[in-house]
């Protein structure tokens, strides 16, 4: 029996640590005979499409169970699903640990494995085809996917997401020897990549430090764990997890990007690239680090560049600057030397927030004659830097019927105000947006004062109203928007708050659960049914099926009707369903963690 368990452990370790060096540095491998670059015009990656095709029957069965449990009135679930294929995508915004923890509560509300007495939305995670995250949302999606898509309950019980100390010093002053060992190990790991003749940036150090709380259960905190290794996880092999996508932005040094000109880079376990006209190409994730010329290797091929922590760090590279703060601590001198050596590079010194992806895999690519393909170097930044802080863009290319957009951004007083949706809406009219349609949304003032950030809101409820955006109106997803707000915890913590004790952590997670479930269903006993109505809406429209009276009632309550608010601001406090000037409902007397602004780690200019 002991031997049997040892064999299982060996198999697991083999599956989850495929870096050829068995460490952080990439290593040489045999080159494949196939082309490593492909055009985005070919559509979804064949491996991804095969995964989705195999997963969909599983997801559809879970959707059937959810819809049956949602108590939809006068609606035959089985008959509808026999002729319809609704597809769900989940998108988790950036926002540091605020976004990760609130998002954890939100995803736990969708998970049928969560232990709860109020399973209002349980099963939607199992019914989803895609899950995307950027910046703090990438910490959530990346750590879950890298841990076999464990439930949030299991992540906590297994000791992950231990945030009592900052990821900059995971063990803290209480364990000085272990803390120095961590810094020594991180320094050695990053040095090994540099010694293998790969450029390193602050993201390499930051990504390794970040892996301590996020990849705690992997060997050596994930120094050899690759993002492409997710495909070897048992829940991926059995098609039990939504397909995970992380997001970053491409940015040339010393330039500024906005929603209209950014190159949105997808980091999936299979591919790395962008649908945007500025690139429109993808490379096999496993072979990042290989020098390519027009998609063909010019020398040795490498695997191991796609370290999972490095990828999560890339998506959240805003936090690179945090690494500079540890140079003031008692860290080993050679780690300081590595940081100093990185900053000798004038590009990396003046662009602290970039991640170096050198060599550029798209160099001289025949399919793209843009600034990206003409440069030997590729630099990526935080996925939210262009203002699109919810990773909706990749889902718009994957023909989903409904998108759950979880917005835990910092727009006003560390609360979201809809800016991310506004930026994604505006982008469709730019050359980079390439006409990929997204539903109408209002301005930020309307978002707040029509209470669209205080209770869930649906956008794109009627496809017939989208004809001025696209002729393919049924291909535009309905967006289910849920913004961070207080119910049981004042969850507007600073993006740069890097420590949470167990009570704070649980407070944030629990509040996220309440956001998604509408206070455990207490504010609307038809909330599950209304979510079901939103999920099935596009397929109903495609088939000319009229909504039930219940669904019409739901849409009356939750759909934005096109109104733009011009009146006086309603206030900054929260009621159950909106903003208010009153301080009698959600305030310091009855909600824990009141206005915990956290501590900024960024140096003031």
From Swiss-Prot:
EC class of the enzyme, as a word: hydrolase
Compartments reported by the entry: Secreted
Glycosylation sites: 199, 261, 399, 451, 465, 492, 573
Record domain PLA2c: where: 30-565
Predominant subcellular localization, coarse grouping: secreted
Phenotype caused by lack of the gene: Reduces dramatically the ability to penetrate host cells.
The keyword Signal is annotated on this UniProt entry: yes
Cleavable signal peptide: 1-17
EC numbers on record: 3.1.1.5
Functional summary from the UniProt entry: Catalyzes the release of fatty acids from lysophospholipids. Phospholipase B may well contribute to pathogenicity by abetting the fungus in damaging and traversing host cell membranes, processes which likely increase the rapidity of disseminated infection.
Protein name listed in UniProt: Lysophospholipase 1
Organism of provenance: Candida albicans (strain SC5314 / ATCC MYA-2876) (Yeast)
């Amino acid at each position: 029996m002991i031997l049997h368990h040892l064999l299982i452990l060996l198999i697991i370790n083999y599956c989850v640590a495929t870096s050829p060096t068995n460490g952080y540095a990439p290593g040489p491998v045999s080159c494949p005979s196939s082309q490593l670059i492909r055009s985005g015009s070919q559509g979804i990656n064949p491996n991804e499409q095969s995964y989705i095709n195999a997963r969909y029957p599983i997801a559809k069965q879970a959707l059937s169970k959810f819809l049956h449990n949602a108590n939809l009135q006068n609606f035959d679930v089985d008959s509808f699903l026999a002729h319809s294929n609704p597809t769900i995508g989940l998108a988790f915004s950036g926002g540091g640990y605020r976004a990760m923890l609130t998002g954890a509560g939100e995803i736990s509300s969708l998970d049928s494995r969560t232990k709860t007495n109020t399973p209002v939305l349980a099963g939607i995670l199992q019914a989803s085809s895609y899950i995307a995250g950027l910046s703090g949302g990438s910490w959530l999606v990346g750590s879950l996917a890298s841990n076999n898509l464990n439930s949030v309950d299991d992540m906590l019980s297994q000791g992950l997401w231990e945030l009592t100390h900052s990821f900059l010093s995971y063990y803290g002053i209480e364990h000085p020897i272990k803390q120095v060992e961590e810094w020594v190990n991180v320094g050695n790991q990053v040095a090994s990549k540099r010694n293998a003749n790969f450029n390193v940036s602050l993201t390499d150090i930051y990504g390794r430090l970040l892996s301590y709380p996020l990849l705690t259960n992997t060997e050596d905190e994930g120094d050899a764990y690759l993002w492409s290794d997710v495909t070897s996880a048992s829940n991926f092999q059995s098609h039990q997890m939504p397909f995970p996508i992380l997001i970053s932005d491409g940015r040339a040094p010393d330039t500024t990007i906005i929603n209209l000109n950014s190159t949105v880079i997808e980091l999936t376990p299979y591919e790395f690239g962008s649908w945007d006209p500025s690139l429109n190409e993808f490379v096999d994730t496993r072979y990042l680090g290989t020098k390519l010329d027009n998609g063909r290797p010019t020398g040795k091929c490498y695997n191991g560049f796609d370290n999972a922590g490095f990828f999560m760090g890339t998506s959240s590279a805003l936090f690179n600057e945090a690494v500079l703060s540890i140079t003031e601590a008692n860290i080993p001198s050679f780690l300081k030397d590595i940081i100093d050596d990185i900053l000798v590079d004038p590009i990396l010194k003046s662009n602290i927030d970039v991640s170096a992806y050198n060599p550029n895999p798209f160099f001289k690519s025949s399919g793209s004659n843009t600034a990206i393909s003409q440069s030997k170097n590729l630099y990526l930044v935080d996925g939210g830097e262009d203002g699109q802080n919810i990773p909706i863009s990749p889902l718009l290319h994957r023909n989903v019927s409904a998108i759950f957009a979880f917005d835990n951004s910092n727009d006003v007083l560390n609360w979201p105000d809809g800016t991310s949706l506004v930026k994604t809406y505006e982008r469709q009219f730019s050359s980079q947006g390439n006409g990929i349609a997204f539903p109408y949304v209002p301005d930020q003032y309307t978002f707040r004062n029509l209470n669209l950030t205080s209770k869930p809101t649906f956008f794109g409820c009627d496809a017939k109203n989208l004809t001025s955006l696209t002729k393919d109106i049924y291909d535009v997803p309905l967006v289910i928007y849920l913004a961070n707000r207080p119910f049981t915890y004042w969850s507007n913590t600073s993006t740069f708050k890097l420590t949470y004790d167990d009570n704070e952590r649980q407070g944030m997670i629990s509040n996220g659960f309440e956001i998604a479930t509408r206070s455990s269903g207490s504010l609307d006993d038809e909330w599950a049914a209304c979510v079901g109505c939103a999920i099935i809406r596009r397929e109903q429209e495609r088939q000319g099926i009229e909504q039930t009276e219940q669904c019409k009632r739901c849409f009356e309550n939750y759909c934005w009707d096109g109104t733009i608010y011009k009146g006086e601001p309603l206030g900054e406090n929260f009621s159950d369903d909106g903003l208010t000037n009153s301080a009698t409902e959600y305030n310091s007397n009855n909600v824990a963690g009141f206005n915990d602004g956290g501590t900024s780690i960024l140096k003031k200019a």
